[in-house]
Every structure is written in C-alpha cells, then in structure tokens.
Amino acid sequence: MTYRYVIAAMVLAFSLVPDVSLAQVNVTGTWQPKNWTLRISLRQEGTRVWGFGGQQDFWFRGQWDGDRLVLVANNFQEKRKNTCKARGVFTLSGKTVSLLDGVWFQSDTGRTLKGPWVRLSPDAGAAVQYPYATELMYCGTLQTYELAFASGSDVLQGTDWPILAAVADLLKKDGALTIDVAGHTDSTGDAKANQALSERRAAAVKQALVTKYGADPARITSKGWGAEQPIQDNGTVDGRAMNRRVEIVRAR
C-alpha cells in the first residue's frame, strides 16, 4: 500500500500529565493516530526515538528536548527508491505513555487537525534501523534532532550518535559526496551570541564526524545561521524547540 501525503511541516503538541515524571516516559509501542489510517511503530532508547508507519513507507525520528519530543517525519518510500513525498517536524509535549492528545498543523495547506494518538500496545514489533543514508540521498537534508546540546552549550551530549555514523559511512562509500553542516538556534537571547553558538555547534558536529567516525574533513563544511532561518514560529515553545537544530545537507 502506498501512502501519499503532501506535508511541508507539522507540529504535534501534546498535553502534559503532571503526575508522571519525564524519566518514566518511554513511547515504545504501536500507536494509532486518530486522523490517520496507518499505525505507527515507535522505539525509544534513552531520549532517542525512531520508527515507521505502514509498511515502512513513513518514517519518524527524533529526540526528547526537555518535556517535548521533537520528531522529523518523512515519506521517502525507501522500498520504492522514490523521492520524498512528505517532510515534517512534530513537537510532542506529553508525559503519558498511553494517550497523546494534541494538534498537528500542515503549513503547506494551512489545515489543522486535532485528535489523540492512542498507544495500542507497548510492543513496537521487530527492531529496525533507521535509514539515515536513504533520507539524506533522497531528501537532501537531515535535521538532526537526535543530537542534543545543553542550553547555551556547543558540547554534544552522549558518546555515540547513529545518525553521524550513518553519514560518515555514506561519505566513505560515495567518494564524490560532500556535505554542509548548518547550525541553527531559536531567537531567544542575543543575536550575536546565537550566531556564534550556531557556528560552534555546527563545528562540533563536523568534528564528531571526523574524529569519531573517520569522515574526510575536506568534504565537510560547517556554518552557523543563528536564528536567521526558522522553520516554525519563534513566538511559541513548540516552534523554538523545532528551530534549535543542526542540519546535514547534501551539497552535491
């Protein structure tokens, strides 16, 4: 079955459940969004979350950012080796593991849909690896919400980053491939400080690709954009969570 969506950006903001701590949250399982016909399998390890919908046509990946789960959604149809049919960014703000009640917005059409995601089962099925290389080659950009920085810091949290391992492996396999690493912040605080921070974060991602995963530094550029290129409204908490990102862009 083929799922066809035309989505430029999505926001999914969920209500908080105050008696459940963030440390207890794990969204691993099979989910049914009210407004979709396909079921979604999500898997969580630490703060990283990834999964798919349907027959692995629609993919999700991201990470908890405070009390919000920022996810990228792609419908690049890996099995059919097709180009991207949908891209989106979700912000989930929820501390329940059975019902996520919220709203998602299609910015290309202006349509807003409300309704819950219900977890049908804590079983996500067989483990699958997220196809980062396919997304980069067919979509052109990886918004790396899996890479976490403390507020105001340019130090990558954690010690292993599957998304960077996949990008480095792709660079080794494709000798003609070059990439740009672009850092972005939200608009909170001083513009000059945000610009400098975005540059340092982009440089940190490049450094991790080179020193940990053996990528060729000559084929990677890094640049910071500060708050100049938001993808959502900086006037909202959800929008700011999506705007804080590092992107890996296929340069050729």
Language model regions located:
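Bacterial N-terminal signal peptides that target proteins for export
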Residues: 1-8
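Bacterial N-terminal signal peptides
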Residues: 8-17
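Sec/Tat signal peptide C-region and signal peptidase I cleavage site
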Residues: 17-23
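Central antiparallel beta-sheet cores of small beta-barrel/beta-sandwich binding domains
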Residues: 24-96, 101-104
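Extracytoplasmic/secreted envelope proteins and their assembly/folding machinery
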Residues: 28, 161, 165-168, 194, ...
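A mature extracytoplasmic/lumenal domain signature
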Residues: 46, 55, 64, 73-77, ...
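Periplasmic peptidoglycan-binding/tethering modules of Gram-negative envelope proteins
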Residues: 92-178, 211, 252
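Periplasmic OmpA-like peptidoglycan-binding domain that tethers envelope proteins to the cell wall
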Residues: 182-252
